[in-house]
Amino acid sequence: MTTDRAPRVAMLSVHTSPLDQPGTGDAGGMNVYVLELAHALAARGARVEVFTRATRSDVPETVVLDGVDAAGRALTADDARDVLLAHDVPPGVTPPVLVHHVPAGPFEALDKNDLPGVLCGMAAGVLRSEAARRPGWYDVVHSHYWLSGQVGAIAAQRWEVPLVHTAHTLAKVKNASLGPGDSAEPSVRVVGEEQVVADADALVASTPVEARELVELYGADPARVHVVEPGVDLERFRPGGPGARDEARRRLGLPTDRPVVLFAGRVQPLKAPDVLVQAVGVLRASGRPVPLLVVLGGPSGRPTAVRELRALAVTLGVDDDVVVRPPAPRDELVSWYRAADLVAMPSRSESFGLVAVEAQASGTPVLAADVGGLRTVVEDDVSGRLVPGHDPQVWAEVIADALADAPRRARWAAGARQVAERYAWTTAADQVLKVYAVAAEPR
């Protein structure tokens, strides 16, 4: 990789587009990660092109995002094209990020277990894109999730450039943390991950926990594993002023006279929203104050997941205490965090936990399962609580204790913002650029 200019990056996100709405289907924290990292790298002069599988026939072949000239004005289409094709990015210019929708398989969303069958088509589409450029155009391939890693290994070998891989989640970790009704990850994924770990010139882990899992469970060379903590948009996600909570609740149609606990994420066994519904049931049965539980998310995996969660609430007699809303756009999400007294994450596995960081940046304490990356991003009794296990009785006690102690919640809220301020995309981008440079060195 040349060192006299910022790199040209082929970023792969095969199974989900960074433009998709997080919180339903396969869209989640990884979508946010890819998009935010791409923008942060572009702000440092890198030219980033994201390749994702086209799931509809009516999506544009290429979407051009942002791009700013030296005076801070948005680039015109012609200027954006000139910047993308130039040898060097002019000083003060932020190049646009491109998102390419690659036809591979049917124009529809596919279950992740069916996606290995379209990887050859995806690889061919990525290689065709490079063929339209000058030879040696890309400097590095950065793949996200194991499916992208399979395509990335082919592209990196063909272009003779380094492969950097971010797993986001790992099958062996998930299979050790299955919840009721959850399905084990197939062996094809386990083998695929092992191949990518062996092929990659550098592996990016979000936390020291994930780095250790890559080494201990997948035999990764510790020298090739780099911990780069993701960032959070600290301008978008920040505490409101006096009265912000009630204002957010009125805007969102939530009561102002009742505690609110928020779950934001996909409705699936891995995220365990059922634990929170059962915890509300425990509180209702015990006669203690019961918060309103807001589940902000859509189904992932089973289309019936939301209906099943509502049915559980009815069975437990807490259907009036549980509200399910669809995923919120990014600009609206901060209002949901501000509206909540607590954000709860009873996940059975999390490689990082972006929701926890966003909530803390918004000044909202987090109750998180004591698992994976959540142990890193939530500081126990500083920005919330780390809750052992997934027993609804335990979660009910922790929720009740937190809601009954307003001074402690106020202390947590202040600590939450301080914890979140450690996570900045600018820092993450700088560290990833260093990883790209290291990956280009001979092994």
Curated annotation (Swiss-Prot):
Pfam families: Glyco_trans_4_4, Glycos_transf_1. This is D-inositol 3-phosphate glycosyltransferase. 1D-myo-inositol 3-phosphate binds at residues 15, 26-31, 112, 145, 169, 189. Gene3D superfamilies: Glycogen Phosphorylase B. GO terms for molecular function: acetylglucosaminyltransferase activity; D-inositol-3-phosphate glycosyltransferase activity; magnesium ion binding. It catalyses: 1D-myo-inositol 3-phosphate + UDP-N-acetyl-alpha-D-glucosamine = 1D-myo-inositol 2-acetamido-2-deoxy-alpha-D-glucopyranoside 3-phosphate + UDP + H(+). The keyword Magnesium applies. UDP-N-acetyl-alpha-D-glucosamine binds at residues 21-22, 29, 266, 271, 350, 358. Its EC number is 2.4.1.250. Mg(2+) binds at residues 337-338, 340, 364. The gene is mshA. The keyword Magnesium applies. It comes from the Bacteria. Homodimer. Keywords: Glycosyltransferase, Magnesium, Metal-binding, Transferase. Belongs to the glycosyltransferase group 1 family. MshA subfamily.
